[in-house]
């Protein structure tokens, strides 16, 4: 799972049983030129540690935060990977790994498939996975099939426009994307704007260098301004999910990624706002 901050890696049996997991930092310097080399080194290191030869490894799957074509190619630059993209990731990584088969998919799409296969959505035919991390990703499965779309961009819900008056630019180059409000970076950005707009309001985050986790922690501890930001974020995300529900009518939404670790301080207002916006049969 290649993210903007870390790459999370797992060693699995072919039955889907997780044997071990670890992570390595994502080096996005120099337009991400070290990303695949570092991934290959991490995989090879674990293979050596476990005494695994290349022929004993069935394959390697990589989830990337952007569109993917034909389970091989990342056709555009990924907004949260420092300009990295436009690669035949499968071919390049396979070569680095001595010919091991490599398949590539959008991170949220493969997360959704994993949840339907072995996780929270096991048995579901239609579900939507939302990943809240450095960016916002989405994986949409309808009647058992991933919605890839014509250009591999199906489910890119982080780039749904939720504010057409936004002047700040998203990493994708557009304005007013969901990712600008509901990702970890978006929460920090919006919290800073709220602090600037309310200079006389007390807030435990004022004057500090904070992360999204700190905003949720402050809201949980009773900080009114932080709670206001969390509610705004939940409202924006709830509206986006309601719009997706009206289009795909999923059996469930699954929320993952680092921001989801906030727990009930996020999910309680999110469910409330979703119900406010959702079509009554969804």
Residues covered by each model-derived region:
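ATP-binding/phosphotransfer module of carbohydrate and carboxylate kinases, centering on a glycine-rich
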Residues: 2-59, 68-74, 93-101, 114-124, ...
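Short, flexible active-site-adjacent loop segments at beta-strand->alpha-helix junctions, enriched
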Residues: 66-68, 79-81, 108, 152, ...
């Amino acid at each position: 799972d290649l993210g903007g901050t870390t790459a999370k890696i797992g060693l699995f049996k072919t039955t889907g049983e997780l044997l071990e997991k670890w992570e390595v930092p994502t080096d996005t310097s120099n337009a991400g030129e070290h990303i695949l080399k570092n991934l290959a080194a991490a995989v090879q290191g674990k293979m050596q540690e476990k005494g695994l030869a290349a022929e004993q490894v069935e394959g390697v799957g990589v989830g990337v935060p952007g569109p993917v074509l034909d389970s091989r190619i990342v056709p555009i630059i990924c907004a949260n990977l420092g300009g990295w993209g436009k690669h035949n990731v499968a071919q390049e990584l396979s070569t680095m790994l001595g010919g091991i088969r490599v398949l590539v998919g959008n991170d949220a799409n493969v997360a959704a498939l994993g949840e339907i296969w072995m996780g929270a959505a096991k048995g579901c035919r239609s579900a939507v996975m939302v990943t809240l991390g450095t960016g916002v990703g989405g994986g949409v499965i309808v009647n058992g099939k991933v919605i890839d779309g014509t250009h591999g961009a199906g489910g890119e819900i982080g780039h749904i426009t939720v504010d057409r008056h936004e002047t700040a630019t998203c990493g994708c180059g557009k304005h007013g994307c969901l990712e600008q409000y509901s990702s970890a970076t978006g929460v920090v950005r919006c919290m800073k704007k709220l602090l600037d707009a309310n200079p006389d309001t007390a807030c435990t985050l004022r004057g500090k260098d904070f992360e999204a986790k700190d905003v949720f922690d402050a809201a949980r501890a009773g900080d009114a301004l932080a709670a206001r930001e969390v509610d705004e974020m939940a409202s924006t995300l709830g509206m986006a999910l309601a719009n997706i529900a009206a289009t795909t009518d999923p059996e469930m939404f699954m929320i993952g990624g680092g921001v989801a670790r906030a727990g009930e301080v996020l999910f309680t207002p999110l469910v409330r706002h979703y119900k406010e916006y959702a079509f009554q049969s969804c």
